[in-house]
Structure formats: C-alpha cells, structure tokens
Design a protein with these regions (language model features):
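Conserved catalytic core of the tyrosine transesterase superfamily
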Residues: 1-344
Length: 344
C-alpha cells in the first residue's frame, strides 16, 4: 500500500508567503500551545503537505486558501491509502491551521470550520491480565536482585590485572546495570501508567520517596503528581544505587534512566525495552509502554478506583478518554461470565 503522504507529483518549494505561514504555525504550536515535539512535527508535516497541494492549485499566499483546496488535499490522502485515524488527524491539523490563519487576519473566513470531522473507530486496547503482569514483575525483581548482588560482588573484589579481565568485568557490570534499569522501567510504567515520553523525561529529584509520589510533566507541559507503589520505588532505588553509576558519564546530566552510552534514555529505546521484556517473559500480547499504560488503568478500575482519580493519574484532559477503560473492564467481565456461569 502506498504511503499516505506519497503524492502523484513530487513536492516543490513553497511560495514564500506559504512557507512563512507554515513557519509561524509551527512556532505557535511549539511556543503558545506547548505541544510535544512529536505532535508539532506531525502537524507541521501535514500542513506542509496541504500547502504544497494548494500551491499546485495556484495558491501563493494563505488568503487564497479555501474549502476546495482542503477537501481536494484530503481526497488525495484518502486515495493514497491513508488510514482512517491518519485522515482524522490531518483534518484536525487543517482546521487548526485555518483557525490560526483566520485569527492572524490572513483569511477573511475560516474554511476549516466547514470541513467535516471524521470520526475514528476507537479500538479497545490490549491489556495484560493481573496474573500475567505479576509473573513478569516477579521474574524481573528476581533478576534485579541477582544483578544488584553481582555488581556488589564485583565492586568488593580485587581489580583485575589483565586488560581482558578488566574488559570482561566492565561488560558484566554494564549488563547487570541494564538489567536493573529495565526492571525499574517496567515497574514504573505499570505502577504509574505514565506515557513513554514522560518516563524518559524523569529525573531522580522528581520523586518524593516519603510521600511515594513522582512529579510528571505531560502533554501541554502540564505537571501532575502521580502515586508510586513500593515495589516500583524499590526497583528505582536499586537502579539509582547500583545500576546508574555503572552507566553514568559526564553527559548524563540529571536524567533518571540512561542508555548504555550514558545519555538520557530515549522513547524509542524505552519501547524496545518493554517489548523485549514481555517477549522474554512469554507474553504473547503485543503490549509496549502504551499497552502497559492501558493495563495499569484497567487494573485500577477493576480494583475499585474511581474514574476521576484514574483520569487525573493518567493526565487525560477529558474524562471521555478515560472511559474507554471502563469498556475494557466490562468486556473482561463478560468474557469471565461466559466462561464461568453455567447458564451463560
């Protein structure tokens, strides 16, 4: 299937007025709306594609942009095989841009306000069962204790004389440190339900160990305080005490989690860590960090947490976003009923 952004004609340089409008819109998203770099890149890429299409239709400045250009661009995206969710996002990007241009006085009317909203089908998230999650974390805790003991034993021993022995010791120390880090990463994801970008942005100073909470900076640069369970705090402390010093370099800064080169852990690596840990534990469901977030929320609701508390913990701006987890819990209840009730 052709990529949704692939058009029949190669894109050319935008006319100066359109290029300036795109740059202003990108600054607005980044500085005024405080959107994440990922969202800014996605919206800017969408609008760049839309303006390239408009330029080919003879539009040289924002004031020439109208509803036909918007609809024509979205029609091309649909014909190119864009997924329903992608089309919905690109429509939202177009509406955001024209509203921005209208407020700036570049447009006499806002054509995006007349653009229909494409409703996406929200799929129920994949979640792990509580016994599956417990088995994974129990195994990681055991591996973490073994790694901690290995680092302590290596530190207490005599320095190796031969270069090869020193290299082997360093390699084993790094391997043990990575095991401690990975255990803390998964424990913290499950304990808090935070997003992968939020976890990667954490510093040790964000934790209040006495109150068992962590300060998280989420979407829109909004800060919230999230509870952390004892096992997760124990895993984090184990990593900070025994693991992090083995990976830290001058470039590490205050980052909580580090990659093997000593720099702040990036979201891509964090996703890989979670996928690998679950696969090694024999979990067949495809659940990365976002799946663990879904799992944490579902388990909270199954345990009796109220929806508003879960909304606050996850950092959802709308309660409707959190309500999907109630559907997950109901579906699981229905499945259990069908399996267990004699007259189901």
């Amino acid at each position: 299937m052709k990529d949704a952004g692939e058009l029949a004609e190669p894109p050319g340089p935008l006319p100066p007025a359109l290029a300036a409008a795109l740059a202003a819109f990108e600054r607005y998203l980044r500085l005024e709306r405080s959107l994440s770099p990922h969202t800014v890149r996605a919206y800017a890429g969408d609008i760049s594609s839309m303006l390239e299409h408009a330029s080919r239709q003879g539009v040289a400045a924002p004031e020439g942009l109208g509803l036909p250009e918007l609809r024509g661009w979205l029609a091309i995206q649909h014909e190119s095989g864009a997924a329903r969710a992608t089309l919905a996002r690109r429509g939202a990007a177009a509406r955001s841009f024209t509203a921005f241009a209208y407020r700036r006085g570049w447009l006499a009317t806002d054509p995006g306000s007349r653009l229909g909203t494409l409703k996406t089908r929200r799929a129920l998230p994949h979640v792990l069962r509580q016994n599956e999650m417990a088995a994974v974390l129990t195994g990681l805790d055991k591996a973490g204790r073994q790694a901690e003991a290995a680092i302590a034993a290596e530190a207490a021993g005599q320095p190796a004389d031969a270069a090869s022995q020193r290299a082997d010791a360093a390699s084993q120390r790094t391997e043990a440190a990575v095991a401690l880090r990975d255990a803390a990463v998964l424990e913290l994801f499950y304990a808090t339900g935070i997003r992968v970008s939020e976890l990667c942005g954490l510093d040790p100073g964000h934790f209040d160990h006495g109150r068992r909470t962590v300060r998280v900076r989420g979407k829109g640069d909004k800060e919230r305080t999230v509870p952390v369970g004892v096992p997760a705090l124990r895993a984090v402390n184990r990593w900070l005490t025994a693991g992090r010093p083995a990976l830290a370099t001058a470039a590490s800064g205050p980052a909580l989690f580090l990659g093997v080169r000593g720099r702040r852990l990036d979201p891509r690596t964090a996703r890989r860590i979670v996928h690998e840990l679950l696969r090694e534990a024999g979990v067949t469901r495809d659940a990365g960090p976002h799946g663990i977030r879904h799992t944490a929320a579902t388990h909270l609701l199954e345990g009796g947490a109220d929806l508003r508390s879960v909304q606050e913990m996850l950092g959802h701006s709308s309660l409707a976003t959190t309500q999907i987890y109630t559907h997950v819990s109901v579906e699981r209840l229905k499945a259990s009923y069908r399996q267990a009730h004699p007259r189901a």
